[in-house]
Amino acid sequence: MLNFSDISYAERGMVATINSNRLKDKGVGQYQNAYNYKNQNFEDLRASCLKMGELFEDPFFPAEPQSIGFKELGPKSQEVHNVYWQRPKDIIHNPQFITNDFSPTDICQGILGDCWLLAAIGSLTTSPKLLFRVVPRSQSFKKNYAGIFHFQLWQFGHWLNVVVDDRLPTKNNKLVFVHASHRQEFWGALLEKAYAKLNGSYEALTGGSTMEGLEDFTGGMAQCIRLQNPPHNLLRLLRKALEKSSLMGCSIEVTNSDDVEKMAHNMLVKGHAYAITGLQDVYYRDKLETLIRIQNPWGRIEWNGAWSDKAKEWEEVMPEVQMQLLHKKEDGEFWMSYEDFMSNFTLLEICNLTPDALSSWDYKSCWHTTFFEGSWRRGSTAGGCRNYPETFWSNPQFRISLPETDDPEDSSDKSEMVCTCLVALMQKNWRHAREGPQLLTIGFVVFSVWYVQFQNLQDIHLKKDFFMKYRDHGFSEIFTNTREVNSHLRLPPGEYVIIPSTFEPHKDADFLLRVFTEKHSETWLLDEVNMLEQLQEETITDADLDQNSVELFETLANRDSQVDMYDLQKLLNKMSSKVKSFKSKGFSLDVCRRMVNLMDKDDSGKLGLHEFHILWKKIKKWMEIFKECDQDRSGNLNSYEMRLAIEKAGIRMNNRVTEVVVARYADANMIVDFDNFINCFLRLKAMFAFFLSMDTKKTGSICLNINQWLHITMWG
């Protein structure tokens, strides 16, 4: 019996994509119906362990060196020397999963450089509703304990249920990585382990932004604001973000690697991720002072300036305010003035939440959200940025309609009628490739277009001439080598096209494009519909027959005046060699078989004289299309030209089909000769013909049994 492992990687990818899309259509991947990561079902695994009287051991993230790291934390590293994996019950008496008095200061950083992740976790603890979406609180080390725990994490548009065992790396009976400020609590360490499993290893978590962690814990969209040049309404944005239960982080960026996690005289750490946990106005010296509360994920080392724990400013505020806000202990959490915040920090990150993460009373503050998964594939859909006009048009394209303006900040202000639109482009799975490829430089361009330009363009992939004509309409061109690139846009109502791309062409990657708007909007993929155009069939009369070709046909034909695919190959190669204006290496036997299939009307497997001449007429037309699309007159097509040539010949393909076609018929340099062009075109034409002949009710779908499927795919 054929196993899934017998299928090629490319075929597995196609099957996986189809199955994934089917599950997505059923709602799998939403928070309420998360995917089981690695197909591991928590309830089933726990029940099995309880029945067998065993503690769970995760085969997909084993208690072995490769789960810890591969380079700085690799098996030969001193950092992991004498590291042992232990379960909490073996580390301490009466371990607790989570206690009721959790706070941002519960979680402390270990030897791993993932302060960005801890800052995100710290922000998460300020909202129990969000925390318990990620950390199901019904778990414990007592009732139904089987050494297995699970967490809900968001990855690239989908929620995943990630299972881990509770074996944790320790040294001298102490946790090596994340640990609680009081040793009995283990939810933070196990959450870090689940996140490490999702990304391949603990070391894969080294270096990142708080924004990344916030998004993966909430499914929200993060904004990045440079505080050297802040928006004029930044304080209002901060207040609004806290009102919406948004999660926030801040940091002091460094330009010199030697300054990373270097402490300034005021005890702020450069290149270190902090969480913003509150905002408060207090009366100080007869005026209102805005304070901002910040938390250091280390659980220690606090700001020592104005409004710090021991600062004299607290002596001049009301005692009840002191009691409410001031906690004099070394817990990593501190207050500072808004002015000092702006003077010291350089980067602010805000994670805007999706509707499902908000309470019902927050409905008015919900964003309208849309997301698309896509890919860039070398030779087909990886066209690069606008610096490469010959291929830029081949990138995936998305149309957005913004018909409704935001509510004005002041009901009396009608001067600025705009639509707030957050656009974010994320590249997938880059942490999994830490030992190989790194982050690509990605970005997007937004084109403003008139509605009239889009009439009758619902299902058409815009071509090069469109972008050359409307080149000046493109804006918001941002390219960086980060996991995500985003932009906070305030646009007039209208129609727009978003083009996500890598900076350079021919770079393979998968991406997620998300659009958040304050008001109703419509966003969809702008792509071709797979379609075979009904072109007029060629006919031929006796007067059209060329005497030389007739004689050549008769010398190769059998006694019935017909040629099979072997004779057809000889015939076509002789005739094409006489076409001096056309360069060809000859026709392969596979192409000749497809031609016989296309033209054979009586199922004889052979062609008669008239059938052959109609075929030759078609071939000459295909030669003209090939030459027309061969812009550099090289005698071959590049893969982008092939797509245009196939369209001119009567077949429109969407991006997914184009990616498969290029992978199958282009060579290593993305070049397609005439034989492969014809082979591809005839295969597509045959598959369309099979499908349309069986889809008698024009439903767009057919049902086949295994015999029919094999017959069509093997003969097509």
UniProtKB/Swiss-Prot annotation:
Keyword terms of this UniProt record: Calcium, Cytoplasmic vesicle, Hydrolase, Metal-binding, Protease, Repeat, Thiol protease
Subcellular locations according to the entry: Cytoplasmic vesicle, Secretory vesicle, Acrosome
UniProt-listed SMART domains: calpain_III (SM00720), CysPc (SM00230), EFh (SM00054)
Coiled coil regions in record: none
Gene3D superfamilies: 2.60.120.380, Cysteine proteinases, EF-hand
BP-aspect Gene Ontology terms: proteolysis
Chain residue ranges for the region called Domain IV: 545-715
Active-site residue numbers: 115, 272, 296
Enzyme class: hydrolase
Segments forming domain EF-hand: 587-613, 617-652
Annotated positions binding Ca(2+) 2: 630, 632, 634, 636, 641
Domain Calpain catalytic: 55-354
One matching Pfam family: Peptidase_C2
Residues annotated for Ca(2+) 1 binding in this entry: 600, 602, 604, 606, 611
Molecular function GO terms recorded: calcium ion binding; calcium-dependent cysteine-type endopeptidase activity
Region (Linker): 529-544
GO cellular component, as recorded: acrosomal vesicle; cytoplasm
Keyword Lyase applies: no
EC number: 3.4.22.-
Annotated spans, Domain III: 355-528
Function: Calcium-regulated non-lysosomal thiol-protease which catalyzes limited proteolysis of substrates involved in cytoskeletal remodeling and signal transduction.
Summary of subunit composition and partner proteins: Heterodimer of a large (catalytic) and a small (regulatory) subunit.
Family the UniProt entry places it in: Belongs to the peptidase C2 family.
Name of this protein: Calpain 11
Species per Swiss-Prot/TrEMBL record: Rattus norvegicus (Rat)
